[in-house]
A protein has these predicted regions:
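Extracellular Ig-like/FN3 beta-sandwich strand-entry sites
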Residues: 23-27, 128-130, 168-170
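Extracellular carbohydrate recognition and processing domains
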Residues: 151-161, 169
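Beta-strand acidic-aromatic groove motif in beta-rich domains, primarily in extracellular
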Residues: 183-194
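Short beta-strand-plus-loop segments that form exposed binding edges in beta-rich domains
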Residues: 174-185
Length: 215
C-alpha cells in the first residue's frame, strides 16, 4: 500500500498494482501489509522533478580520482571537520582502491586501524537521462548535491537509493568512505562501488573505472 500526500499508509490505503505515475514533486510512503493485517516498516521515497543537471567542461581530464585519507575512528562525516590528524593525498586508478588493504586481525576488528577516505573527481555520464544510484559508501555527492547518504547505517545493505537527472558529459563527484564498525558490521566488508541504471532499465550496473576522471 502507499500514499502520495505524505501521510502514513494504513492497511486501507491504495494498493500498489501498477507503476506509480506522478507529474511533479511528490512524497511516496510505502508499506507492505501481511495477510494478518500487520504492516512492515514504512519506506519514504521523495520524487523531485528536475531538469538535467548540466555537465562541466574540464581541461585535459585524466582517468582516475584524487583521494585523501586520515586515520581515526569516525562515525559521522562532520567529525572530519574537527579531525586533528594529518591527511594523506594520492591518486587512484580504481574506486576499489579507496579502501586500504589490511588483514582482519584482532586490532583491526577492534577499530584500531580505522580511517576515513574522500575521493574526488568527475563521473562521465554517457547520455542525458534520469539515473538511479545505489551505493554502500557513507556518502556520494554529484554536482555538489548529496545523492546517497548512508551515514550511521549498517553497510551490509543499502536502502538509500536515489535518482538524479544528468546531462551527458562530466559531472563533479565526491565519495566519502568511513572505515568503521556500525552494528557489528565493518564497513570495509561492503562493496566499494557505485551502481547506476537509467530509469528505462531494470538492472543496476557498476560504474566502470573508465568513467571516473580527475584534473
Amino acid at each position: 500500500v502507499y500514499t502520495l500526500d505524505g501521510t502514513t499508509p494504513t492497511p486501507s490505503s491504495t494498493v500498489y498494482t501498477v507503476p506509480i505515475s506522478v507529474s511533479g514533486n511528490t512524497i511516496i510512503r510505502i508499506a507492505t501489509v501481511l495477510p494478518t493485517g500487520k504492516m512492515s516498516k514504512i519506506r519514504t521515497v521523495e520524487v523531485e522533478k528536475q531538469a538535467y543537471a548540466p555537465a562541466v567542461k574540464v581541461e585535459a581530464p585524466k582517468q582516475g580520482l584524487k583521494i585523501k585519507r586520515i586515520k581515526g575512528n569516525f562515525l559521522k562525516v562532520n567529525q572530519l571537520e574537527l579531525a586533528d590528524g594529518t591527511w594523506e593525498y594520492t591518486d587512484i586508478d580504481s574506486l576499489k582502491d579507496i579502501k586500504i588493504k589490511q588483514i582482519d586481525d584482532a586490532a583491526t576488528l577492534r577499530g584500531a586501524n580505522n580511517y576515513a577516505a574522500i575521493a574526488e573527481g568527475y563521473i562521465n555520464i554517457p547520455e542525458d537521462g534520469v539515473y538511479y544510484l545505489s551505493s554502500r559508501f557513507e556518502q556520494v555527492w554529484i554536482d555538489n548535491k548529496l545523492v546517497i547518504n548512508n551515514e550511521g547505517d549498517v553497510k551490509a545493505s543499502t536502502t538509500n537509493d536515489s535518482s538524479v537527472a544528468l546531462a551527458k558529459g562530466l559531472h563533479p563527484i565526491k565519495i566519502v568512505f568511513l572505515s568503521n564498525i556500525v552494528g557489528g558490521w565493518p564497513s570495509w566488508w561492503s562493496k566499494t562501488s557505485i551502481e547506476m541504471r537509467k530509469d528505462s532499465e531494470q538492472q543496476f550496473t557498476e560504474v566502470d573505472d573508465s568513467q571516473y576522471y580527475k584534473q
